[in-house]
């Protein structure tokens, strides 16, 4: 069983999303035997944003006259897609930045959203090719966006749900810590609530993994 763990917060010791993903991964290891993890820190080791040259290298393979940089970027794109497709569980730390996801996470998504690899177009419309995965997103936000007057500005969780759904990933769980910029009291209460929700999420994911194993 393979786990892909991604962090994208530009913060380190003070990052709420990193604290949450660390606890999620720890609890997953305790709940699921033989869980092999691959970790990427998308902020510490950022992936280059999509360019014309990088996109041209998705498919087919780079031409013989491609420069070394293009060949290297193609190899990285292939590695990122392979890691994603090979994973049974994906854990993503995704704080809200300016109502959306960190640019570092968007760069990774742009590499793995490849026609013919993770989705395809058919006569009946687009079809995701990355189904069967369990996705857990550790979501941290400065204010309250799950409900209330700011809900319409949520282009973070809504974007992730839509994007991974397009790729075929239907089982998406959010561990959400809101109000992180609303003072120590509300921030601490929201973090405690998010941490308390992890146990239920891990149980649900573990059940899904067992169900997948039985079907296989």
Swiss-Prot record:
FMN binds at residues 9, 15-17, 96-99, 140-143. SUPFAM superfamilies: Flavoproteins. Gene3D superfamilies: 3.40.50.360. Its cofactor is FMN. Binds 1 FMN per subunit. One of its GO terms (molecular function) is electron transfer activity. Pfam families: Flavodoxin_2 (PF02525). Its EC number is 1.6.5.-, 1.7.1.17. It catalyses: 2 a quinone + NADH + H(+) = 2 a 1,4-benzosemiquinone + NAD(+); N,N-dimethyl-1,4-phenylenediamine + anthranilate + 2 NAD(+) = 2-(4-dimethylaminophenyl)diazenylbenzoate + 2 NADH + 2 H(+). It comes from the Bacteria. The keyword Oxidoreductase applies. Keywords: Flavoprotein, FMN, NAD, Oxidoreductase. The keyword Oxidoreductase applies. InterPro entries: Flavodoxin_fold, Flavoprotein-like_sf, FMN-dep_NADH:Q_OxRdtase_AzoR1, NADH:quinone_OxRdtase_FMN_depd. Homodimer. Quinone reductase that provides resistance to thiol-specific stress caused by electrophilic quinones. Belongs to the azoreductase type 1 family. This is FMN-dependent NADH:quinone oxidoreductase 2. It comes from Xanthomonas axonopodis pv. citri (strain 306).
């Amino acid at each position: 069983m393979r786990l892909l763990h991604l962090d994208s917060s530009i913060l380190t010791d003070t990052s709420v999303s990193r604290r949450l993903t660390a606890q999620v991964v720890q609890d997953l290891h305790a709940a699921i035997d033989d869980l092999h993890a691959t970790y990427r820190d998308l902020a510490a080791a950022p992936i280059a944003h999509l360019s014309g040259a990088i996109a041209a290298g998705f498919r087919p393979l780079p031409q013989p006259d491609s420069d070394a940089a293009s060949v290297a970027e193609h190899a990285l794109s292939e590695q990122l897609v392979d890691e994603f497709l090979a994973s049974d569980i994906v854990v993503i730390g995704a704080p809200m930045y300016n109502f959306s996801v960190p640019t570092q996470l968007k760069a990774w998504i742009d590499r793995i959203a490849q026609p013919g690899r993770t989705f395809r177009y058919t006569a009946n419309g687009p079809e995701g090719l990355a189904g069967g995965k369990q996705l857990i997103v550790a979501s941290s936000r400065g204010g309250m966006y799950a409900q209330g007057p700011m809900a319409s500005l949520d282009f973070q969780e809504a974007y992730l749900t839509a994007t991974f759904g397009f790729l075929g990933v239907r089982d998406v769980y959010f561990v959400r810590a809101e109000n992180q910029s609303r003072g120590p009291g509300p921030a601490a209460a929201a973090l405690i609530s998010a941490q308390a929700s992890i146990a239920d999420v891990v149980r649900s994911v573990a059940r899904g993994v067992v169900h997948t194993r039985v079907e296989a």
